[in-house]
Amino acid sequence: MKKRILFTAAALVCAANLTAQCLGVGSSTSSMSPEEMAAAAKAGVEYVEIGISGRGTVAEIREKALHAKRMADEAGLKVWSCHLPFSRKLDISVLNDSARMANLEFLTEMIAICGEVGPEKLVLHPSSEPIADGEREQRIRNSIASIGILRREAARIGAQLCIEDLPRTCLGRNSAELL
């Protein structure tokens, strides 16, 4: 029997072995009620992705993630992945090294929270946008270095770090750009 996956990302590049996966389309658990999760499970969905919010204190973010996990468990759904927070402020490719390191420290804390949720995969944005052409080469190098650090953190919790292909001016608009 094929397993159906409720998933917010349609295509991922997994940083651990850099292979593409097409996993389907769905909805974020952060916007789903317990009734909607139960209905999804009844319809044959087996897996969900939990979106980890970057808003609030670390304790508040942790509680939201664990609440989503409890709701999924109660509905009979398994957590396949967690989507790490992303924003212009949390960009892992920024040129300012101290800002980039602060972003990596925060995302490392978020990965530890994900460890309590138990996903197989973590989804990461390789940048925000817009990115000027004159900055792109260095920002790609910064993103690749940051991905290496976060991949090791993901491995510590037993998860595979997956890089979401992003359109427009974002880094990683195709997998070759980050290889």
Regions inferred by a protein language model and the residue ranges of each:
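Hydrophobic faces of well-ordered beta-strands that scaffold small-molecule active sites
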Residues: 23-27, 48-50, 79-84, 122-124, ...
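C-terminal segment of classical bacterial N-terminal signal peptides
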Residues: 15-19
